[in-house]
Amino acid sequence: MSTYYKNPLIILTVCGLLLLPLTELTGLTTTTASEILIYAIAALGFNILLGYTGLVSFGHGIFFGVAAYAASIIQVKLMPGFIITPMILSVLFTTILGLGIGFLSLRLSGVYFSLLTLSFAAMTFYVIYRWTHFTGGEDGYGGMERPTLFGIDLNNQTAFFYMVMLIFIAVVFLINRLVNSPFGSVLTAIRENSQRASFIGYDVKKYRLISFTLSAFFVGIAGSIFPFLKYYIGAELVHVAHSGEILALSILGGSRHFMGPALGALFFILFRELLSEYTSSW
């Protein structure tokens, strides 16, 4: 029976189900509960790279923000009335982008890798901020809508929360299977001693690239949901500071523990929202 209590999938699922009454108990909104789950997905995805592969990226806000913009633009301009298809297409685009950025960034290692990802984040922010007629620039991008899905009106905040909850559970399941697979064991070996892993016969660069791409994929899932949370997005989603926030979530909860990043998202957003009730400038 004790194995059930130690299973991170079960624990995080239960925590997710308790999240809605917890936020209501603290006087916060259902929107906040949904935001916590979205950032928990992003942090868990980022932690594939940080906690399991041992690489520090300062550019993962790129994948969150680009997925958000892609989902928004696809829905508003190409697929009004749809939500799942724009999300899927945006995640696919973000994954390909992650593969490209990972291929270029992983030519370097250590602090140079981190600085290169930071440079990509700064460049992406500049492009989105300046590409006014396509992204809205400093005014941001709006016009997104939540349609009815399988007869359920997603404009209802509780219904939208449970949609995000289902995605969260699926992501937790997939990442849990991933990190506990032989592939996950190789990533851990690379994190502990990449030279030794190379001597054993593992292609370290290939595994790091796969890890980077998978991390971008899961962060992209979080980003694809975000524009439908508040019906608006801004260029700050791809800013270096936002990448730093995603990094902070993993570190705050504990990057060496599977559940740590999700708990980091919970503590960070709850603290931010509760603090805003007592200060006027948060």
Predicted features, each with a name:
Residues 120-153, 184, 277-281:
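Extracellular/periplasmic helix-loop junction at the C-terminal end of a transmembrane helix
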Residues 61, 88, 208-282:
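Transmembrane alpha-helical segments in multi-pass inner-membrane proteins
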Residues 39, 68-69, 91-95, 118-123, ...:
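Residue-level recognition of pore/gate-forming positions within transmembrane alpha-helices
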Residues 1-12:
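N-terminal membrane topogenic signal
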